[in-house]
């Protein structure tokens, strides 16, 4: 029996979510969903991770964030569900930190992964004072 679960996430930015999936080398596809709100057509972009058993994993936009929808009993990814979420969250956060920091003039100069799986990113700015 199939039981799909919606997991609340903090993934709010499609660009960073796609970058995180790419870093984990997890293939996905974009899926546009038409929404007819107040007679004006809008589209949500959801991400689908195809699985060979046809129980695909999806990230559905709920208007605020991407919810992870999956059936854990049919999960066939290289990582267990909890590990997948942790790794994806870490790559997502790293991407947000680096991208947003670059917008204000910082560049990553060092990145270190610790034994516990956490990362430390060192940022610097090349601002010269006269």
Swiss-Prot record:
The cysteines joined by S-S bonds are none
| Major location (coarse) | plastid
Among InterPro entries, the record links this protein to: Uncharacterised_Ycf35
The record's subcellular location field reads: Plastid, Chloroplast
Q: Does the keyword RNA-binding apply?
A: no
> Which terms are listed as keywords in the entry?
Chloroplast, Plastid
Q: Which GO terms describe its cellular component?
A: chloroplast
The answer to whether the entry has keyword Plastid is yes
Q: Which family does it belong to?
A: Belongs to the ycf35 family.
Q: Which PANTHER family match?
A: YCF35 (PTHR39638:SF2)
What is this protein's record name?
A: Uncharacterized protein ycf35
**Which gene produces this protein?**
ycf35
């Amino acid at each position: 029996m199939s039981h799909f679960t919606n997991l609340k996430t903090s993934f709010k930015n499609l660009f960073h979510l796609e970058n995180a999936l790419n870093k984990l080398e997890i293939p996905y596809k974009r899926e546009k969903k038409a929404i007819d709100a107040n007679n004006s057509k809008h589209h949500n972009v959801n991400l689908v991770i195809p699985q060979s058993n046809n129980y695909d994993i999806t990230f559905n936009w709920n208007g605020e964030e991407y919810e992870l929808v999956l059936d854990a009993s049919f999960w066939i990814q290289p990582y267990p569900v909890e590990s997948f979420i942790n790794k994806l969250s870490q790559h997502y956060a790293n991407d947000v930190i680096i991208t947003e920091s670059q917008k204000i003039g910082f560049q990553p100069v060092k990145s270190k992964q610790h034994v516990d799986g956490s990362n430390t990113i060192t940022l610097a700015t090349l601002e010269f004072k006269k």
